[in-house]
Amino acid sequence: GFMGATYWMVPDESRTELYSTKLAYFQLVLWTVMGLVTVTGYLFRYGTGNKLLEQPLPSKIVIVIVMLMFLYNIAMTIKKSGRFTTTEGVLMGGLGLAALLYLPALLEFENYTVAIFYRWWTIHLWVEGVWEMIQGGFLAYLLIRLSGADREVMEKWLYVIVGLVFIAGIIGTAHHYYWVGVPSYWLPIGGLFSALEPLALIGMAIYAYSAIRRSGLAHPNKLALHWTVGSAVFTLFGAGLLGLAHTFPSVNKWTHGTL
């Protein structure tokens, strides 16, 4: 999903055409075939058995190749245009880190406890780290286009997002650390910082909606505008409130701790 959205956003933001449409289609075909083969393999018990990262090694290698092709295509598009915005920078940072943080998934450990420890470096730092950077980039782009919000102000919010992601997201990984040999003080610290992650995205949406009311701007595509702001609201209730409900150590040991 975010690959397709990026292929739309970056050329529009850079005011140029995509570097290679053929490469994008080849990437899509390769990704689709890999997904179908991998899921079919699960039916025959062909997988690693590592929860959430069950893909066999050949599939993981294809995922890495697809991500590298994707990043190359996007980077060359930006280079061709000569225009590079903060919105694109945050998006590219998130996409690059998404590829980088998948590398721990390629490692294999005989000790399952060690495997659990490093698994969250991919799963948590994807979901509650770089994906929020990616979402922030998309959200800023849409709000600038749809609400008439000031680009400079919106991009300042992106810096806040990056800061919260690196502080709250990275430290928040600790709320997964049950029975893996780390000191117990990491559990409440991880739970606290995990609850801070959606705040910047909500603030950005509130600012944009306030800007609409102040300026009286009525964008003709009201559905897209409300869907965009609604995405941030869902982030508040999903990643924020529901996420907070199970980051408390007494709850999380039954949700994540037993994985």
Predicted stretch roles:
Residues 1-13, 21-45, 57-76, 89-108, ...:
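Hydrophobic cores of alpha-helical transmembrane segments in multi-pass integral membrane proteins
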Residues 11-14, 80, 179, 214-217:
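Short, flexible helix-adjacent loops and helix caps
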Residues 18-19, 151:
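Solvent-exposed interhelical
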Residues 49-59, 85-86, 114-125, 182-194, ...:
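Non-cytosolic membrane-interface motifs at loop->transmembrane helix junctions
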Residues 78-84, 110, 210-216:
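Juxtamembrane/interface segments at transmembrane-helix termini
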Residues 83, 115-119, 124, 147-158, ...:
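Hydrophobic, small-residue-rich membrane helices and short re-entrant helix-turn-helix hairpins
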Residues 220, 249-257:
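Anaerobic metallocofactor- and corrinoid-dependent redox/one-carbon enzyme cores
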